[in-house]
Regions:
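N-terminal accessory segments
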Residues: 1-61, 119, 257-258, 263-264, ...
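Walker A/P-loop
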Residues: 56-80
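Conserved Walker A/P-loop ATP-binding site and its immediately adjacent core
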Residues: 90-111
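Long, charged, glycine-rich C-terminal linkers/tails
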Residues: 120-136
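Short, conserved loop/helix-junction motifs that constitute active-site signature segments
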Residues: 185-190
């Protein structure tokens, strides 16, 4: 019997999902009933992405842009609770944007702790308003599970193994400096984890910048966005085939639901590469759009923009819909959908523009462009000698230091169709950028 218990504890320690299902209780959304913590499809994908990253990099650095009620915070709470309650000398730090949110998070953790099976429930040394310390004067786990609100007590200089920063886009004035202090408490490697998650709050700000830096692969972080339509709860079945056909026939004709935008959503898809398996693919169905209409009517007070804010379809839509822009958001969102659709239908080619490849006395051409999949130049349409082109350039400082430096960008436009046919995006000295733009101009 004792040997069986040892084997069970070992499995619980090495298999977080087994631990979630058999040891943790959470409150079911809506009913408030305590239920076993079983991962939904979004949580399951995030879990596999994190496990893959920790196997590859010996740590997790993940930034998550989310829609409402996907259970991202619940998953991170459960993951970190498992780390602290099943391992010695671990420190968990969770920081939220408001005291109310901090209280909700801590109550979730306390519920997990209070309902643990007694056989694996660690001894509690201290439990305060926003802190649990497992251990005893004689030893024990000596693991700390602590929560705080941004702007609260200083944590700079502390050692943190697992950091969760919640709703970072809402951290407000001083939030970026506070975040920097927290991140510097987490060392690289050693299976440490730092997870930043938030709904969008417009363009600009530390969360927006960090997300896009990670998305482009320039920061050492991994970015992920979960669109609303991949969640199985966000569908509404039709009563019969006739109702489904009738719905399809009028799709995109009602301005309350976005008009043409609604029709363009049908078939929009996303994929998640979670390892050795084939990528998981999710696609907008008529059932998704049926639920979308109901949600706009009942949960968003017939306000389409509120739906965009709460349930974005793309990462760009998430940031655009929540900002205070000059241009109409509906049209911007429609343009985003058009661009996403076109990028799937006409993928870009990658190229590299060598800098100062030419020297006097060599036969090599002065201005050259070389094919390279991950190059700084994206090309959707190669030059057509029968056309003229225009190049617009936005020159940045050029220094490739840190995530706060801007990108220099050159965009090639076909003035006859107003299409963007190529884009150069890089961080180099402005003089060297001029060489690249000259090469681009020679090509076009």
């Amino acid at each position: 019997m004792e040997n069986d218990l040892v084997q069970l504890v070992a499995k619980l320690q090495r298999d977080p999902v087994f631990y979630f299902n058999n040891c943790l209780k959470i409150q079911e959304f809506g009913t408030g009933e305590l239920i076993p913590f079983e991962l939904n499809e979004v949580q399951g994908i995030l879990h596999k992405m994190m496990q893959r990253q920790i196997d590859r990099d010996e740590h997790v650095r993940m930034i998550v842009l989310k829609a409402r009620r996907f259970g991202i915070s619940t998953y991170v709470q459960g993951r970190f609770f498992h780390h602290a309650a099943m391992n010695r000398n671990k420190v968990v730090q969770i920081t939220t944007h408001s005291k109310a949110a901090t209280d909700v998070m801590f109550n979730m953790a306390r519920t997990m702790e209070q309902n643990l099976p007694k056989e694996i429930k660690p001894q509690m040394k201290y439990s305060g308003k926003r802190e649990m310390h497992w251990g005893s004067d004689e030893g024990g786990l000596n693991s700390l599970y602590s929560l705080s609100t941004v702007g609260g007590r200083e944590v700079r200089g502390s050692k943190v193994d697992f950091l969760h920063c919640s709703e970072v886009a809402s951290w407000g004035h001083g939030g970026e400096e506070y975040l920097l202090g927290l991140l510097n408490c987490v060392v690289q490697g050693f299976k440490t984890e730092a997870i930043i998650e938030s709904t969008a709050q417009g363009t600009g700000g530390v969360f927006h910048d960090m997300f896009w830096d990670a998305y482009s692969g320039d920061s050492g972080w991994e970015a992920v966005f979960f669109p609303w339509f991949m969640f199985s709860h966000y569908t509404k079945d039709f009563k019969n085939d006739d109702e489904r056909k009738e719905f399809n026939a009028v799709l995109g004709t009602d301005d309350r639901y976005g008009g043409e935008e609604e029709a363009k959503l049908l078939g929009v898809s996303c994929e998640f590469d979670i390892g050795a398996e084939d990528p998981l693919r999710f696609e907008v169905t008529l059932e998704n759009l049926n639920w979308r209409r109901q949600c706009i009517r009942t949960q968003c007070q017939n306000d389409l923009n509120k739906f965009h804010q709460e349930f974005p379809s793309t990462a760009r839509e998430a940031f655009v819909s929540t900002g205070r822009g000059v241009f109409p958001r509906e049209q911007l969102n429609e343009m985003v959908l058009d661009a996403e659709k076109l990028s799937r239908e006409v993928p870009s080619e990658g190229f590299h523009i060598p800098i100062q490849a030419y020297k006097e006395g060599r036969t090599k051409e002065k201005y050259i462009i070389e094919a390279q999949d991950d190059g700084e130049l994206q090309v959707w349409m190669r030059p057509n000698k029968q056309r003229d082109y225009r190049i617009g350039v936005d020159v940045a400082e050029g220094l490739d230091i840190g995530r706060d430096t801007d990108w220099s960008v050159a965009v090639v436009i076909d003035p006859h169709t107003f299409e963007e046919v190529a884009m150069l995006r890089c961080k180099i000295d402005p003089d060297l950028l001029a060489w690249q733009v000259a090469s681009l101009g020679k090509w076009y």
